[in-house]
Amino acid sequence: MFFVLSPAKNLNEKDPAPVSEFTQPDLLAESDILMQQLRELAPQQIAELMHVSDKIALLNAQRNAEWNTPFTPENAKQAVFMFNGDVYEGMDANTLNTDQIQYLQGRVRLLSGLYGLLRPLDLIQPYRLEMGTAFANLRGKNLYEFWGDIITNLLNDTLAQAGSNTLVNLASQEYFKSVNTKKLRARLITPIFKDEKNGKYKIISFYAKRARGLMVRYAAEHNITDPEMLKNFNYEGYAFNDAASNESEWVFMRSEQIK
């Protein structure tokens, strides 16, 4: 069983990682192709392409200019500790022990517009390139065309090497679109997290993102290898709802008063 997650726009570049172990991204040669093109963009072009402020555009122009290989602990940081959004706050990898970090490394993969597919301990340098960005490149009009089946093939290889036949999709639609599900050689399970509001259960983005990270933390803390055991996930008041679920979409609900 493997999990896939989206990355985060917010990055923690300052705090040192709590572990020294690191690996290198498998698709760094592809990242280098993209970065060569990104470096050609002026800050104003970045602002228009990514729909960000001038300040953020300037920051990322500087990041692009400084991006260089090889990655080392001195100029890069492990992805799971660099990403700093709602999902990663829910996971809170900084407080996991060594065995639990190894669980993440062995069973979690992070989708990325620039890096394709990352292991949690893969070193990365700061960047901003969301998968849904309409960034015309050498292979097409956007990043989905750039990556093609590269991410899917690496996922299939990863699953095969581990003897696994299940992929738990905890990524956003924007990122999971980079995976060709028709060519994916695995059973696909997509957990859905719903919160009660005014008597109705609905997906609330902030809570759903945090819950994705919480589920990965739950799996690591309980060393889960059987997907069925994920139905016992109960962090922060969530509970599996069998009646609302089907074989591929597992729904977890949380009542309003529990928060």
Swiss-Prot record:
Biological processes, Gene Ontology terms: response to hydroperoxide
CC annotations in GO: cytosol
InterPro entries: YaaA
Domain of life: Bacteria
Entry-linked Pfam families: H2O2_YaaD (PF03883)
Disulfide pattern: none
HAMAP family named among the record's database cross-references: UPF0246 (MF_00652)
Similarity comment text for this entry: Belongs to the UPF0246 family.
Protein name per UniProt: UPF0246 protein NMA1114
